[in-house]
Amino acid sequence: MAKNTVSARFRKVDVDEYDENKFVDEEEAGEGQQGPDEGEVDSAIRGGNMMGALQAVLKNPPINTKNQSAKDQAEHLVLKVLISFKANEIEKAVQSLDKNSMDLLMKYIYKGFESPSDNSSAVLLQWHEKALAVAGVGSIVRVLTARKTV
């Protein structure tokens, strides 16, 4: 038989601390992320440096923030850059991106598909075709299963 004790020390252990599925709000980590620098992106577009504009717009994504206006502004800025590209420059731009930037680009492409504007769907389909050819199906799987959205 078990020994009857009056001790309550076992109740001081927080078992939820060791649960890997426990939700942890990461809002504090994303406070500094307000999205890409709009001035830098606009100056690159005006200067004709489309590769620089693409790199700048993918540089500081508002992934860890819950600020929806920052996410919408970043989405609008990315869409503006993608539309500014000529059709024959898209493949070269996609090939210049690394794996993380490619996944981020795919996130923005799918986000653009959620709310299509005038001719954005055609441009996004061109970008999706080129990105899929370079990154493969794995990029789509990573985007669709990611918990952090843009």
Curated annotation (Swiss-Prot):
Keyword Translocase tagged: no
Major subcellular site: cytoplasm
GO molecular function: actin filament binding
Transmembrane segments: none
GO cellular component, one term: site of double-strand break
UniProt-annotated location(s): Cytoplasm, Cytoskeleton; Cell projection; Nucleus
Keyword annotations of the record: Actin-binding, Cell projection, Cytoplasm, Cytoskeleton, Nucleus
Disordered: annotated segments: 21-45
Record flagged with keyword Cytoplasm: yes
Gene Ontology biological-process entries: Arp2/3 complex-mediated actin nucleation; cell migration; regulation of actin filament polymerization
Subunit relationships: Component of the Arp2/3 complex composed of actr2/arp2, actr3/arp3, arpc1 (arpc1a or arpc1b), arpc2, arpc3, arpc4 and arpc5.
Function: Component of the Arp2/3 complex, a multiprotein complex that mediates actin polymerization upon stimulation by nucleation-promoting factor (NPF). The Arp2/3 complex mediates the formation of branched actin networks in the cytoplasm, providing the force for cell motility. In addition to its role in the cytoplasmic cytoskeleton, the Arp2/3 complex also promotes actin polymerization in the nucleus, thereby regulating gene transcription and repair of damaged DNA.
Family from the record: Belongs to the ARPC5 family.
Official protein name in the record: Actin-related protein 2/3 complex subunit 5-C
